[in-house]
Regions:
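N-terminal secretory signal peptides that target proteins for export/translocation
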Residues: 1-7
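Bacterial N-terminal signal peptides
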Residues: 10-26
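Short linear Ser/Thr-Pro motifs
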Residues: 19, 130-136, 562-566
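Boundary at the C-terminal end of the N-terminal hydrophobic targeting segment
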Residues: 30-33
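C-terminal PAP-associated
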Residues: 36-97, 101, 107-109, 164-165, ...
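Calcium-regulated, polybasic anionic-phospholipid
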Residues: 112-115
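Noncatalytic accessory or regulatory domains flanking protease catalytic cores in secreted, cell-surface
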Residues: 117-171
Length: 681
């Protein structure tokens, strides 16, 4: 059982105190205990199964703390397993796939939870096995590693709970098979949404001038277009100008639709009041629900933010209070929309503007009634209790982990999605904090057929024109799921797997936007590669997929918006810090313009030589495989999110449907139909 950490709560699984653990780490030599029989072995695709016995372990230990060379006898036992592939893994996995399966069993007369971990030659940690639970009598965990690298692995036996020391037995198999080959994406069927991707240009250096490059803003030496992890995006519905914000820069993009394909002119319009960059957030109060097209730029700064706004597309900015108090220390969000009835008696701006942020235990939201200049008090949106000085979640009614971005529906209901919310049975599920009274009170509602993945990424929510809400999330199995509610989250439709047409086995960064009540778009990064996406050894190739519904979520049309250009090769890290696979940071963003055209702002982690070089990945580099280039995927064909504009090609009347897409409808329950490759990707 791992030590699970999230911003909402910490679940300890150790029988050791922290001080004892510190003594252990400082006084124990950096060596692995190897007292099992035998202490080492080798396995290949032709060797058949190998097996061994682990020595007895007990007493409990903390696992996965980042110190993989310490394995004290009696609490841990290692077995060195040399894995031999027919060819080096970098070349072998271009055409083949493999699975290393460890069946780990034990018997004890008292409740016992033993765990097995597999530590790769590069130090990547896989495990524990499944089921990760407590048993009396016989116990079992099965750990499967997909596409393991060659070299010496440490297979580790530890005890999360073992009042009586227990030995374990391991049987390991290695199977290989030809990697399924998918044909190139089919030409998009008529009506399939299609996209063109616009990457930010390089900084201008003499003698180069825009539009072939981007001129850094006054006072900046760079526009930081390659530092665009966790971007947010907005569009001014009056001028058509798009904004993508990441780091300390607000990039303005002007599209020229008089030519085909449209061209993009990039400018650095950063706010002079964005002095620091911790978490950057941009929000445009666009014309979707009658907004003024005011754009907000927020930079987290301690327990508030440096917030400013522009009413002239970034030519000038006005600083504001930043947030109400109290406020959280992480992962802030700015959003807005119509007021719920009854509206405040005094307001000087047509929409409520919300500032929400994650604190150590709960999360707070405050509301502005003057267009973001000042904010009222921050109010907690989750419920916790304190037991013996320790904050504990209350089920139901609380969420842990990091929340997503606040969204407001036409009827004024405010929604803050979260990946880990507890239902009445204490099960952690994706859910949403809901306020129907302009942020004064909140209630948490969960999706009953969803289950949280850890570590995960933010879910996303959006409301249609008649208040139907769409919640996109990554499920416990790693799949991209989306659920629909027409009563503010009291009841949900059965979640649909948007990645089915392309065989998506792992997804990250769910982002949702809606238009007409029955239309929505769901963007996510996905890969058909199974396995642990947090592992340094993960070799998945990630693309940007966007699913559309035109019938309130009954069926979805999924397209690959980056069919010939991966967004990432390798792992995508979700646990903070400076891991090399955290180049994309925590999320992407999505919006819609006044023509119903969907735009997705994302960081491209695989650029230049990485696009075609299969040996590159985010773990080992080079820099082209660890990039975060500001990029916009802009819809150029197919039906958008407003039925009134169907067939106009977003008012350009070009009829252009150039792009990559695969028209596929349905899910496993209702059946898949569409293009010839719908079931082969």
């Amino acid at each position: 059982m791992r030590l699970v950490r999230s911003a909402g709560w910490i679940v300890p699984v150790s029988l050791l105190s922290f001080s004892a653990l510190s003594v252990l780490f400082h006084n124990t030599p950096a060596a692995s205990a190897q007292t099992g029989t035998p202490p080492s072995s080798s396995i290949s695709s032709s060797s058949g199964p190998v097996s061994w016995d682990f020595a007895a372990v007990g007493g409990g230990t903390v696992t996965n703390v980042g110190i993989q060379d310490i394995c004290p006898p009696g609490m841990c036992d290692d077995h060195d397993l040399t894995l031999i592939l027919p060819a080096p893994s970098v070349t072998f996995y271009q055409t083949m796939t493999a699975k290393l399966t460890i069946t780990y069993t034990w018997t004890n007369t008292v409740p016992t939870d033993l765990d097995v971990f597999a530590i790769s030659p590069s130090g990547a940690d896989h495990g524990p096995g499944s089921p990760d639970d407590t048993s009396t009598g016989p116990g079992i965990e099965i750990l499967t590693v997909t596409d393991p690298v060659d070299g010496v692995w440490h297979i580790r036996s530890v005890a999360a709970l073992a009042p009586l020391p227990a030995s374990a037995h391991a049987v390991v198999t290695l199977t290989t098979a030809a990697r399924p080959t998918a044909p190139p994406p089919s030409p998009p069927a008529p009506g399939a949404p299609t996209f063109v991707n616009y990457a930010a240009p390089e900084d201008c250096t003499a003698p180069n001038t825009p539009p072939g490059c981007i001129q850094p803003a006054l006072g900046s030496t760079t526009a930081s277009t390659h530092g665009a992890g966790e971007p947010s995006i907005g569009v001014n519905w009056n001028t058509g100008k798009a904004f993508i914000e990441a780091g300390n820069h607000t990039l303005r993009v002007t599209f020229n639709d008089s030519v085909t394909p449209a061209t993009a002119f990039w400018e650095d319009q950063r706010s002079l009041f964005a002095r620091v960059s911790l978490d950057p957030i941009l929000f445009t109060d666009d014309g979707h629900f009658g907004g003024t097209n005011r754009t907000f730029s927020s930079q987290l700064n301690g327990v508030t933010s440096e917030l400013s706004f522009t009413d002239d597309d970034g030519n000038s900015w006005l600083p504001t209070q930043g947030s109400g108090q109290p406020a959280g220390v992480d992962h802030q969000s700015v959003g807005g929309g119509p007021y719920a009835v009854p509206a405040p008696s005094v307001s000087t701006y047509p929409h409520a503007i919300y500032y929400c942020s994650q604190d150590i235990v709960t999360a707070f939201c405050s509301r502005s009634d003057d267009g973001g200049l000042t904010f009222g008090p921050g109010l907690p949106i989750y419920i916790f209790t304190t037991v013996s000085g320790v904050n504990r979640p209350v089920a139901p009614g609380t969420c842990g982990g990091l929340h997503g971005h606040v969204r407001v529906s036409p009827d004024g209901t405010a929604y803050v999605p979260n990946e880990k919310c507890m239902d009445a049975n204490g099960i952690s599920r994706p859910g949403v904090a809901v306020s129907a009274d302009n942020g004064l009170t909140w209630v948490v509602r969960t999706v009953p057929d969803a289950q949280s993945i850890s570590p995960g990424s933010d879910p996303s929510i959006a409301a249609g024109a008649n208040n139907t809400i769409y919640l996109g999330y990554v499920n416990v199995d790693g799949h991209a799921k989306i659920a629909v509610s027409q009563d503010r989250g009291l009841h949900w439709s059965k979640s649909k797997d948007a990645g089915t047409p392309f065989g998506t086995q792992n997804a990250e960064f769910a982002e949702v936007i809606a238009g007409d009540n029955n239309r929505a778009a769901f963007a996510y990064l996905g890969t058909p590669t199974a396995g642990d996406t947090q592992s340094a050894d993960f070799l998945g190739i990630w693309h940007l997929y966007i699913a559309f519904t035109y019938n309130t979520g009954r069926t979805w049309t999924t397209v690959d918006a980056t069919p010939s250009d991966p967004v990432q090769r390798g792992c995508i890290w979700n646990s903070g810090g400076s891991n090399p696979c955290r180049n994309l940071l925590d999320f992407n963003d999505i919006t819609v313009d006044k023509f119903g055209r969907v735009l997705v702002g994302y960081a491209d982690g695989c650029t230049g030589s990485c696009v075609n070089d299969v040996s590159q990945n985010a773990t080992t580099g080079p820099a082209t495989a660890q990039d975060a280039l500001a990029t916009i995927a802009r819809q150029v064909g197919g039906r958008g999110l407003f039925a009134a504009l169907d067939g106009t090609q977003f008012a350009t009347r070009t009829g252009n449907i150039v792009g990559g897409g695969n028209l596929c409808y349905g899910d496993p329950a209702s059946g898949i139909s569409g293009g010839p490759d719908c079931n082969t990707h």
